[in-house]
Amino acid sequence: MVRASWFEIPVLDLERAIDFYERVFLVELERDVVDGHDAAYFPAADGPIGAAGALMHGESYVPSLDGTRIYLGVDDVEAVVARAVEAGWSLLYPVTEVDDQLVAEIADSEGNRIALQADAD
């Protein structure tokens, strides 16, 4: 079995990205330096479910709307989308129900495509 265990979201401006993710996702990120790269960690859930990750700034980290898509699990997709749009960022894929899940995609402050996922109620 292969299971995702870690993700890194590339950023050009770490402070701008931290502001975006803290405001849109209502989380507090923890700043650090990893192998010479400025980073900001997402809070990790206890237990084996889900992957932990960080925003990463460095020359090998290039934001993109193309390529691998990360789905961030949230409690309320519509609320996250509303906060992102209110903050001036783009909705790339509208909130849609797929197999008892609500999904959507937004562009973050750095030009990454970020997918959102939650259980449909």
Predicted regions and their residues:
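Core segments of cupin and vicinal oxygen chelate
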Residues: 1-2, 8-50
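Vicinal oxygen chelate
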Residues: 2-5, 9, 30-33, 81, ...
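Short beta-strand micro-motifs in enzyme catalytic cores
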Residues: 38-40, 68, 100-104
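Short, charged/polar, Gly/Pro-enriched secondary-structure boundary elements
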Residues: 47-53, 111-114
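Active-site/binding-pocket entry motifs
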Residues: 48, 61-62
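Short, P/G- and charge-enriched loop/turn segments at secondary-structure junctions
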Residues: 56-60
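Mid-chain, well-packed structural core segment of small domains
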Residues: 63-89
